[in-house]
UniProtKB/Swiss-Prot annotation:
To M.tuberculosis Rv1269c. This is Uncharacterized protein Rv1813c. Induction: A member of the dormancy regulon. Induced in response to reduced oxygen tension (hypoxia), low levels of nitric oxide (NO) and carbon monoxide (CO). It is hoped that this regulon will give insight into the latent, or dormant phase of infection. It holds the Pfam family DUF4189.
């Protein structure tokens, strides 16, 4: 009985030592990957043993007075979302009218485009129409 207890204790200590040894070996590798920017969020969270934090995506909708439009969603930064929306719009007079993380929409009243945002498509559409004080929805996007 004492022999089994000693054997289990020895195995537990060996397992703990091996885990610590692997941790010491992995830390320089993780630091090197982080310095190069090549470590993915998934790999980092697996190593840390923590849940993966939600990734925030950004979106934007751009319009020109001519009616030309462009939209972007699932972008990693607000600046990239605006850039993609403006590129897709393709008109020099395009302006971003809605910037969002969840949903965005654009309302038009015949003379002006107005953006809105919300947690859902419906909320974003309502926000755009309310900000314009009327009009109709002409575009929307959600991440």
């Amino acid at each position: 009985m004492i022999t089994n207890l000693r054997r289990r204790t020895a195995m537990a200590a060996a397992g703990l030592g091996a885990a610590l040894g692997l941790g010491i070996l992995l830390v320089p590798t993780v630091d090197a990957h982080l310095a190069n920017g090549s470590m993915s969020e998934v790999m980092m969270s697996e190593i840390a043993g923590l849940p993966i934090p939600p990734i925030i995506h950004y979106g934007a909708i751009a319009y020109a007075p001519s009616g030309a439009s462009g939209k972007a969603w699932h972008q990693r930064t607000p600046a990239r979302a605006e850039q993609v929306a403006l590129e897709k719009c393709g008109d020099k007079t395009c302006k971003v009218v809605s910037r969002f993380t969840r949903c965005g929409a654009v309302a038009y009243n015949g003379s002006k485009y107005q953006g809105g945002t919300g947690l859902t498509r419906r909320a974003a559409e309502d926000d755009a129409v309310n900000r314009l004080e009327g009009g109709r929805i002409v575009n929307w996007a959600c991440n």
